[in-house]
Regions:
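Generic detector of short, locally flexible boundary/turn motifs and exposed helical patches
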Residues: 1, 31-40, 78-83, 91-93, ...
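Contiguous N-terminal and early-domain "leader" segments and peripheral loops that mark the onset or edge
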Residues: 1-3, 110-116, 236, 240
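Gly/serine-rich nucleotide phosphate-binding loop at the start of the catalytic core
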Residues: 1-48, 52-53
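Single, function-defining residue in the core of a domain
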Residues: 4, 15-16, 27, 67-69, ...
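Active-site-proximal, Lys/Arg-enriched surface segment
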Residues: 10, 40-121, 222-227
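Long, contiguous hydrophobic alpha-helical segments, chiefly transmembrane helices and signal peptides
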Residues: 20, 34-37, 73-74, 113, ...
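Generic detector of isolated residues embedded in canonical secondary-structure elements
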Residues: 22, 30-33, 115, 179, ...
Length: 286
């Protein structure tokens, strides 16, 4: 544990730009001792991970029980880009692949990871950080994490972008006491009045008539909001909100919420604040 603490402190102090030889600067041990620990030391990764998870659960769930505030389970993925693919690198990087970057809109070479955060009353802690190597889907990774979460003491929410709004994940989190709040792609099927229709088709019809929109105010800004309550494929009694700024009641051609756009809204769970600028969201029925 002392070696790990020395390594972590060195990483933070150097701003993630140091070398392994810097580890000894913050340790009472010689650098060769730390090198031996890195090369030959043995520790149980799962034990370390389980200890971290138990600590995070204890802190977040205790805060929820004390304050009555919701527990937020926040999921997102990111790519740590590398400058050269393995085919051109002098020393190939282990477990680096080409991944589709939705931020860059193209294939990106590097490590991709799925991060799961737990939050309550302003406290945000990292619960899990899982490397994605294509041997198991990101949907299955998040579902397995959902299954291991204890049922929270208060009504709680799972927050995600459109890539994780799937039947499997929503139903698994529901079983653990979490409602899902997330973005929807515009090709998702809805069933208004029992008629199957893509979300973008429904939105286009509504934008022409301007009917059934409610004008709401969030932080002194006005939005037109349309509420659909009904079925999605594999999900019963879902709520979908379409919202647009008051002066821009139009349907954008591409209406998908990216990870970057999601982050400013993740800490808000009241529905108008979660659904702005033409973004589409899934909400549990109230």
């Amino acid at each position: 544990m002392n070696h790990l603490m020395s390594i972590l402190i060195s990483i933070f102090i150097s701003g993630y730009h140091g070398k392994t030889t810097d580890f000894a600067k913050n340790s009472s041990c010689h650098r060769t001792t730390i090198a031996h620990f890195l090369n030959s030391g043995k520790w149980d990764d799962s034990l370390l991970s389980d200890t971290l998870k138990c600590s995070v659960i204890e802190i977040i769930y205790s805060e929820a029980a004390r304050t009555g505030k919701s527990v937020l389970c926040i999921v997102d993925d990111t790519i740590a880009s590398k400058t050269k693919p393995s085919s051109r690198a002098l020393h190939p990087i282990e477990d680096a692949y080409f991944h589709q970057s939705h931020l860059k809109g193209k294939q990106d070479y590097g490590h991709q990871a799925v991060a799961v955060m737990l939050s309550c009353n302003g406290i945000v802690l990292n619960y899990a950080f899982v490397m994605y190597n294509k041997s198991i889907s990101k949907i299955d990774i998040v579902q397995s994490i959902a299954k291991e979460l204890p049922v929270p003491p208060v009504m709680s929410y799972f927050l995600c972008d459109c890539w994780y709004v799937s039947e499997k994940i929503i139903n698994t989190f529901a079983q653990r006491g979490f409602h899902t709040i997330g973005a929807l792609k515009t090709n998702r099927l809805l069933y208004p009045s029992g008629m199957k229709k893509k979300l973008r088709e429904l939105a286009a019809e509504l934008s022409v008539t301007h009917r059934e929109f409610d004008l709401v105010t969030v932080k002194k800004r006005n939005y037109y909001v349309y509420r659909y309550e009904g079925n999605l494929n594999g999900i019963e009694n879902a709520v979908v909100l379409l919202s647009y700024p008051e002066k821009h009641l139009v349907i954008p051609k591409h209406c998908v919420l990216s990870s970057v756009q999601t982050q400013p809204y993740l800490h808000r769970r009241f529905f108008p604040g979660m659904c702005v600028d033409g973004r589409l969201k899934y909400f549990p029925p109230v």
